[in-house]
Swiss-Prot record:
Signal sequence, renumbered to the chain: none
Family: Belongs to the UTP25 family.
GO MF terms held by the record: rRNA binding; U3 snoRNA binding
GO biological process, one term: maturation of SSU-rRNA from tricistronic rRNA transcript (SSU-rRNA, 5.8S rRNA, LSU-rRNA)
Function: DEAD-box RNA helicase-like protein required for pre-18S rRNA processing, specifically at sites A0, A1, and A2.
Pfam family, one: UTP25_NTPase-like
Keyword set, alphabetical order: Nucleus, Ribonucleoprotein, Ribosome biogenesis, rRNA processing
Biased composition, class Basic and acidic residues, residue ranges: 24-38
Gene3D superfamilies reported in the protein's UniProt record: P-loop containing nucleotide triphosphate hydrolases (3.40.50.300)
Compositionally skewed regions (Acidic residues) per UniProt: 118-145
UniProt gene name: UTP25
GO cellular component terms, semicolon-separated: nucleolus; small-subunit processome
Quaternary context: Component of the ribosomal small subunit (SSU) processome composed of at least 40 protein subunits and snoRNA U3.
Species the sequence originates in: Trichophyton verrucosum (strain HKI 0517)
Protein name in the entry: U3 small nucleolar RNA-associated protein 25
Amino acid sequence: MAIQHKKGGGHRGRGSKTGRSRGRKFETSRLKDVREDESSGGEEDVDGQPTEDMNDSEGTDVSSESGLDEPPKENSYSTLLKLLNTDAKSNEPARKKRKIKANEPDANPVEVSIPTADDTEQMDEVADTEASASEDENMDDEDIPDEDYAEDIGTDGRNDMFELHFGNPDETELSHKIQACSKAWKSTKADLIDGLYSVVSMPDAGGISSASLPTTPSPADLKLKQKLARNAVSFDRLNSCLTPYIFGYHDTLFCSRTTQNSAKLRDLYCLHALNHVLKTRDRVIKNSAILSRENNGDVELRDQGFTRPKVLIILPTRQACVRVINSFTKIYPMEQQENKKRFMDSFSAADSDEWAHKPDDFKELFGGNDDDMFRLGFKFTRKSLKFFSKFYSSDIILASPLGLRTAIEKEGGKKNENDFLSSIEMVIVDHADALMMQNWDHVEYIFSNLNLQPKEAHGCDFSRVRQWYLDGHGKFLRQTLVFSAFNTPELNALYNTQMQNVFGKAKIMSKYEGAMLNLRLPISVKQTFSRFDSASPLKDPEARFQYFTRTVLASLARGWTESSPRKKSGGTLIFIPSYLDFVRVRNHFANSSQTENISFGLISEYTSVRDSSRARSHFMNGRHSVLLYTERAHHFRRYNIRGVTNIVMYGLPDNPIFWGDLIEYLGSAAGGTSTPTVRVLFSKWDALKLERIVGTARVRSMLLEKGGDTFTFV
């Protein structure tokens, strides 16, 4: 049975633990006729059967997204011989030359001529064969330079970070930095704008690092392709601040993404990705033209990776993918957009009217098509954009973590298909906080499969492969950009282990005033924070459970046993961030003598809508004294729970917005006789969460206070 794709809410929930999907798997068979395949957008069905032309998407199967095409398994030497034999038999006239300067002689045509429209057929043949099949099998218009090609290649590249990073890096310095990456990093800290600060880390190779880089006022100050510069949107203060890190090819972890700045951030990284892809493409075309004019074989030009895909963008939903594509087409408008209608039919949907009362962050994430199972190849030619191109023929791959993992993994113990990720030079992870609510294991799995040595050649011309790829050092030149609403231990682990860029990395975070100060309630709420000792993160779950049952639950149980029309501890909401902790607490309530007389309800991310409605109704009416509620359930549903008089937080929420949502549940108790209370459990391993709730100024004293372990705010 094929994987079912639904629009608007069909896939909200955690991803599969193993990353495997039900149904047919991706296979790597490819069409025999390359021209026919490319003209139809390079689309291949999930089971490996070619589809019809996808320009008209009516009646197409949504599950048939971009596959992993397998180029012919022939080595570059035999390909070169075939090309030479073809040239020897050719009776075509000599290729025309066009001089740039009118008075310049023909003595040195290599320096004065550039490819012209008359060279199209031969240029296509050379670029397709000598420049490797991985850079594209298509022989139409995409090996012809852009209109602004001559102007771009004549630009001084000394201040172009693309040239410094990927064009002509100093081999000795590069080797020294790669060795330093595995030893020690030197970090510096600096304040930025609007409460932001940066921590920049550089390989300790004797250089000087700076945490605060000069801002970039506008796109005109960047070394952009001319066509991109004409359509680039203006920079606000935040973009001007981030541009030096992003366009300077630093790895960047940005932990202050909001609904207000998300569109500007998306335009910024899309501009950077397009600039990188187009400059890479122009360099390959330029060098292919040089090689086609040189017959002595002495020229060595290394400008490629093992495979064509250069940019990987990881997103939470299909609608997020639509927004990225819209940014691409806004910055780089093209009249021809193959398979655009099919893409919009498969990926875009209207917002649900039922969510009009939901908060803005919820509508941004789940608005439109919130399916979290997708993958898409995206390809540029001189005249068109091609959707649903095969991975090995794509420039950019956009995917959800679950969708990409199912493309990598193979059934029956076969080797994973990850060669198409071997030459990724830029990874962009947007809305990372939402990806953690799906299944972060999928993201870690994807990073573990990046920049590995390919198992097969895939038609690669190894004479054009950059030396650092051959040496297995691709990960040290890959740029990783991660955008999240807040920082977490998982993101810190990704930053420390997977961001190994020799040009350095930057972590940009916010200083917090504290979510507990921004409550909108007509009554005062007593907020008590209880600190417990925990020896290590591994032992933290056990220490938390013991403290909860022996201290917090024991005091609540006394209130539940008192006789009154509504028990003193009735209306208690117990918020539990982790599902594993939720299961443990649920079992304790079901089996322990401590809670044998307590009626309780359950709402987790796996609870059906019907059962959730019943549990909320019983809790509001007093039939349930306690309601156990998980963070993921709140993330995916944003229930408005009534009847709450007390809140116990088994752990702090990752998202500070959830703190305000939960405290506002107490508004229904405004007419009661007792003051609503909030009690929170935390340990020293909750420092990042605690900072967002109590504020940067208070968190240190609460973690290190020697005089007591209880802190109360009213």
